[in-house]
Amino acid sequence: MSGSDGGLEEEPELSITLTLRMLMHGKEVGSIIGKKGETVKRIREQSSARITISEGSCPERITTITGSTAAVFHAVSMIAFKLDEDLCAAPANGGNVSRPPVTLRLVIPASQCGSLIGKAGTKIKEIRETTGAQVQVAGDLLPNSTERAVTVSGVPDAIILCVRQICAVILESPPKGATIPYHPSLSLGTVLLSANQGFSVQGQYGAVTPAEVTKLQQLSSHAVPFATPSVVPGLDPGTQTSSQEFLVPNDLIGCVIGRQGSKISEIRQMSGAHIKIGNQAEGAGERHVTITGSPVSIALAQYLITACLETAKSTSGGTPSSAPADLPAPFSPPLTALPTAPPGLLGTPYAISLSNFIGLKPMPFLALPPASPGPPPGLAAYTAKMAAANGSKKAERQKFSPY
């Protein structure tokens, strides 16, 4: 890779560990990974930085670079020159058309962006002038997170200098409060509550019109930190706490937990429910998953867990693998309908958007297509146990039907 070290200057290395997250499109990710992973392997070896790329089939992926400041800047330098190399190799549409600049999109906690912009924009203006790179801080939060995208574009040397200065600012100004990281695979669906149909989740590929999808995407760009389900009109989660228990096969529990607990943590944040996964008993083929919270929290958590299980089964062709799966939970067309709503919630139909659960504006009511008579062939039914008020457990068979 010619010129991959061109933007680096010798600096005393700080004794800290720096983590830099970048948002990349699929084509950029493919370029960084290279054939059989050769490019990313070379970047790791030459920079000594730890580089991970998020899994998933969505158009965007998160590339995380961790290491000493020198290692991270070296890796960013090699990535910038690799992307520049790709732009040079791309065929030009016309002889007089200049090729676009190299662009990196950094993902930074919103609480640190104020320091990056500076009073009346003085800091970001200084960075632009001293580095020659274009820097743009997004006005909106990334969907379902407390992070913003910071776009840096220009020639590789200018980008490297700019990233150095940005990192210096964020190291001097640690994030305030908890940070909800951006996950590109996370999108919004719509939860519907009706007296006759109970809880259901409407994915954005179901009966939602294109206009409603557009509005939902616009709302998602104004996401705020996760809120409790108490924002739903007419519901008081504090007075209707209950628990529900699932039995999940051992070979599918991995897709519910996720890598280093990322998936179960995401489900807890999205639903507001407390979720406990029991230890594996000797000789048992299933694990107990207990969900505790308000009826709305339980229903939403149950849907998200069921979506993980059905996605894992469909991905493996119906035959569970021996290794735990680490799968994203996209809100694709829902495969299941959730349990009947509690008696206290029945009555006038409500429309509760998933954005409402995390503090956004409610969506208009969406009509729910009638359910088909039964589940499709091969769709497993899960046994759930609801804890009664007197402490006894009543087992009931829950069969799920598609819309």
Curated annotation (Swiss-Prot):
Subcellular location(s) per record: Cytoplasm
Gene Ontology molecular function, alphabetical: DNA binding; mRNA 3'-UTR binding; mRNA binding; RNA binding
Gene of this entry: PCBP4
GO BP term (any one): regulation of mRNA stability
Main location: cytoplasm
Record function comment: Single-stranded nucleic acid binding protein that binds preferentially to oligo dC.
Domain (KH) ranges: 17-67, 101-154, 241-293
Lineage, highest ranks first: Eukaryota, Metazoa, Chordata, Craniata, Vertebrata
Key word Cytoplasm present: yes
One GO CC term on file: ribonucleoprotein complex
PROSITE patterns hit by this protein: KH_TYPE_1 (PS50084)
Name of the protein described by the UniProt record: Poly(rC)-binding protein 4
Record key words, sorted: Cytoplasm, DNA-binding, Repeat, Ribonucleoprotein, RNA-binding
Keyword Repeat: yes
Highest taxon of the lineage: Eukaryota
Organism from which the protein derives: Homo sapiens (Human)
